């Protein structure tokens, strides 16, 4: 059993724009985060993953970086950052920074130079191509709708941007680019940060020759083939040699489209690349003709199949990261649970139990520990997310989706659901700001807020606190092997964890109907470790699991 601090940690993701505003401008900031560190210490988390706070024109909420060694003015100064880091470390909390190096902002000095002329020293920092028969160099589609090629009249060539037009892709084939990135990473490590979460890192290596891609049925553009490109592992191993191996870091790669076999390469136990990856097979379930824009729910059998494959097939080979939501996903409670007032609390606790009892490093997205849910958006003007707004115009404009249907899809699946302000108390704007918040506040903030949750011993917050505390006490939660029971059951998710002669049985009812379950004989005499309902009576035999009930039994 190869023990590591990051395997035993619980990570809390902060989306800084929406966490806490200290100066009344309606935008969360670094001093706001510092002011709330005692809350996170009380919750018990070990690591904070901070979404980008670098200098940025903010075309894509900070994922378009114009200076990697400066802080976005809306968020504060480098002095504010240094103080925040110091205060985290005083409380025993580590900091993982978001690293965005597939692309920069078009306002980064490298790109400003690159576009000036074809012989500029920075020209090959980016990917430039001539037109093909008067059109884009190939048929690829951008991740944010439309073509990923933008014509630049200055040099009469196109540059590649897999995301927005203001996010030109870096040319990782150029050794000078890699050196710049590694130097910058070392600079942050010397400041004392504890790791990196690497944005779309599986896309940094482009296919040789940038050929046309296959157009999916009903689609408008070809697949770029940039996921898990030909040199991605080479580049990450070089990054590991030049930066990561010199420090005691936690590294996680955001790897959309990654298979279990690929994940083994990215996060192999031999430590040559990353600590772990984010896989999106679970959150990409129930996609439709237009990708995520659908109202389909994820069938529990599919949920179990995906979670189980990653649990069992990476066992002993690589490490899992466990998450049901983040800043790019709708609220996990609304997506996988039941956010109605009647079941909000029990189903939020059930989802947390199901996730935190698995093998891997759990991630808590800000507000999930309060049972925050999707927020109703009634008009396109209320959205702030470039992805949602672009998708609305593209799909309704092409006559593919009716506007009312598209609004429903945006409400169910849009990224702004996770980006509404953190609900601290029942005062105006949920205590997030004394000014006007940059995006609307959830309408339920008067009841669902941190102040209420902390005061109520039976709250979602205090349940998360228990789960996080248990992980520190119970090696079996971290290192035990996983086995799924009853894979075909469409209502219950039941699995075991085993470490030596210790065993846990995790039972989760994913429905609001009562479900019967026969507890295996091996758990006769077992005790309840944690549950989201009061428990009585014997552990073994037939149990009736109430609406969204979760029970964990432990053999001694």
Give the role of each language-model region.
Residues 1-556:
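Active-site and adjacent substrate-binding regions of carbohydrate-active enzymes
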């Amino acid at each position: 059993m190869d023990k590591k601090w990051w395997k035993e940690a619980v990570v809390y993701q902060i989306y800084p724009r929406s966490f806490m505003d200290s100066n009344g401008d309606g935008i969360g900031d670094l001093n706001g985060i510092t002011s709330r560190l005692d809350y996170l210490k009380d919750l018990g988390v070990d690591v904070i993953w901070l979404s980008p706070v670098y200098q940025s024109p903010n075309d894509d909420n900070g994922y378009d970086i114009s200076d990697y060694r400066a802080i976005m003015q809306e968020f504060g100064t480098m002095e504010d950052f240094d103080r925040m880091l110091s205060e985290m470390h005083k409380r025993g909390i580590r900091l993982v920074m978001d690293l965005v190096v597939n692309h920069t902002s078009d306002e980064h000095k490298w790109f400003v130079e690159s576009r000036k002329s074809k012989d500029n020293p920075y020209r090959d920092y980016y990917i430039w191509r001539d037109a093909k028969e008067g059109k884009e160099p190939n048929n690829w589609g951008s991740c944010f709708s439309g073509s990923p090629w933008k014509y630049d009249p200055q040099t009469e060539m196109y540059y590649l941007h897999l995301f927005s037009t203001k996010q030109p892709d870096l040319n990782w084939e150029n050794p000078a680019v890699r050196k710049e990135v590694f130097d910058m990473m070392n600079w942050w490590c010397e400041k004392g940060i504890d790791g990196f979460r690497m944005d779309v890192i599986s896309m940094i290596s482009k296919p040789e020759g940038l050929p046309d891609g296959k157009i999916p049925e009903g689609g408008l553009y070809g697949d770029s083939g940039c996921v898990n490109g030909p040199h991605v592992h080479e580049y990450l191993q070089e990054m590991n040699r030049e930066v990561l191996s010199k420090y005691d870091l936690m590294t996680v790669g955001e790897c959309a489209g990654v298979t279990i076999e690929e994940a083994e390469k990215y996060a192999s136990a031999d430590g040559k690349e990353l600590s772990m990856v984010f896989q999106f097979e679970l959150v990409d379930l129930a996609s439709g003709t237009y990708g995520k824009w659908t109202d389909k729910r994820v069938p529990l059998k599919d949920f179990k199949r995906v979670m189980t494959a990653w649990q069992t097939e990476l066992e002993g080979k690589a490490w899992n990261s466990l998450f049901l939501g983040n800043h790019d996903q709708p609220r996990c409670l609304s997506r996988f649970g039941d956010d109605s007032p009647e079941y909000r609390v029990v189903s939020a606790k059930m989802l947390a139990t199901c996730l935190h009892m698995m093998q891997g490093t759990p991630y808590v997205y800000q507000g999930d520990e309060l049972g925050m849910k999707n927020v109703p958006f009634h008009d396109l003007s209320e959205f702030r997310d470039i992805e949602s707004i672009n998708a609305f115009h593209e799909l309704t404009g092409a006559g593919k989706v009716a506007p009312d249907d598209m609004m429903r899809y945006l409400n169910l699946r849009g990224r702004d659901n996770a980006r509404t302000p953190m609900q601290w108390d029942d005062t105006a704007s949920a205590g997030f700001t004394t000014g006007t918040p940059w995006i609307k506040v959830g309408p339920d903030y008067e009841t669902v807020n941190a102040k209420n949750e902390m005061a109520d011993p039976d709250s979602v917050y205090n349940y998360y606190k228990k789960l996080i505390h248990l992980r520190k006490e119970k090696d079996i939660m971290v290192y035990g092997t996983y086995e799924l029971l009853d894979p075909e059951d469409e209502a219950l998710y039941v699995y075991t964890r085993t470490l030596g002669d210790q065993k846990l049985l995790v039972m989760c009812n994913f429905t609001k109907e009562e479900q019967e379950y026969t507890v295996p004989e091996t758990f006769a005499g077992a005790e309840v470790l944690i549950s989201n309902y009061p428990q009585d009576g014997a552990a073994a035999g037939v149990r009736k699991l109430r609406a969204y009930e979760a029970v964990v039994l432990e053999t001694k």
